[in-house]
Amino acid sequence: VKEEGGNILVEGGKLEGAGYESGCYVSPTIAEAENHFKIVQHETFAPILYIMKYKELDEAIAMQNDVPQGLSSAIMTMNMQEMEEFLSVNGSDCGIANVNIGTSGAEIGGAFGGEKETGGGRESGSDAWKVYMRRQTNTVNYGKSVPLAQGIKFDF
């Protein structure tokens, strides 16, 4: 991110101390980035949150849909029009689209599968014939807090 002109807002890293002795826990990196950055366009499978500026919802959806992957997406809004646009055929092109819930993996109980380069579950699984349909798991949270999977908390 830094090499392409972005800023690291929160430096991630290995968690240490009581409860983290195994060395298998990390804190996320939060970075200001632009959609054309090479790292943004690649599926890193790392705890990195990219913050990108936009003016209109259509611009944000276009940035999201411009990456080659399409597993999971999320929007945080209480605006019903924005929610409907994001969940519509004109919105997220991911296999999983969430409203007011992050892309934590808790949505795996739905009709799971990615799109574009993240489509292995649909193309090789028992639902392979359904790849010719556009399905999407939608989760909408009307609460005042954002639930995270497995009790995860981001206390910075």
Residues of each region from the PLM?
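Conserved C-terminal structural/oligomerization subdomain of aldehyde/semialdehyde dehydrogenase
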Residues: 21-156
